[in-house]
Amino acid sequence: MSKKPTAGPALHKVIMVGSGGVGKSALTLQFMYDEFVEDYEPTKADSYRKKVVLDGEEVQIDILDTAGQEDYAAIRDNYFRSGEGFLCVFSITDDESFQATQEFREQILRVKNDESIPFLLVGNKCDLNDKRKVPLSECQLRAQQWAVPYVETSAKTRENVDKVFFDLMREIRSRKTEDSKATSGRAKDRCKKRRLKCTLL
């Protein structure tokens, strides 16, 4: 008797978005390989996959580090469609990159058409607090307006690097559980309706 193939670990798809030079790649590489790579700006999107243990369960995280082609709307929209959760990164030392998060958020909501998509606002380079250009209160206010978590990270010192990826994976997992319950509830309703129709006949 052949055994049913066992399902592999759950896969969570994360998309990194943000202006150039804010440290999206540095955060990704620090999380993937425990290495700080300064001034790494890829010219094309890079995809990374890693097995991790999330709250005692082995899962896979798939990270798409967007770059360069974000200027091409069709390519950018395809990336956004494939994502289950988003880390929207800016540098606390660069106000322009903070202002740009508004546009990234709007683009994602337009493509996903879903206000409650798993999403974290990430202020990177918190090791350079003496060069801070974006007040903490302003960052927290924006996150509050969007109803999303706000976390400050440093790809250099590794501060909160694991936290943002794991927190986002938890949000994605929670969302999948809710969606699965909703789908199963709708299927049960359809079955009930079919049974009622049979009874009426």
From Swiss-Prot:
GO terms for biological process: border follicle cell migration; defense response to Gram-negative bacterium; innate immune response; negative regulation of innate immune response; negative regulation of JNK cascade; positive regulation of epidermal growth factor receptor signaling pathway; positive regulation of stem cell proliferation; R3/R4 cell fate commitment. Its EC number is 3.6.5.2. The keyword Membrane applies. A motif (Effector region) lies at residues 40-48. Coiled coil: none annotated. It catalyses: GTP + H2O = GDP + phosphate + H(+). It is a lipid-anchor. The modification Cysteine methyl ester is found at C198. It is found in: Cell membrane; Cleavage furrow; Midbody, Midbody ring. Keywords: Cell membrane, GTP-binding, Hydrolase, Lipoprotein, Membrane, Methylation, Nucleotide-binding, Prenylation. GTP binds at residues 18-25, 65-69, 124-127. Residues 199-201 form a propeptide. A lipid is attached at C198 (S-geranylgeranyl cysteine). One of its GO terms (molecular function) is PDZ domain binding. GO terms for cellular component: cleavage furrow; Flemming body; plasma membrane. Pfam families: Ras. Disulfide bonds: none annotated. InterPro entries: P-loop_NTPase (IPR027417), Small_GTP-bd (IPR005225), Small_GTPase (IPR001806), Small_GTPase_Ras-type (IPR020849). Belongs to the small GTPase superfamily. Ras family. PANTHER family: RAS, DI-RAS, AND RHEB FAMILY MEMBERS OF SMALL GTPASE SUPERFAMILY. This is Ras-related protein Ral-a. It comes from Drosophila melanogaster. The gene is Rala.
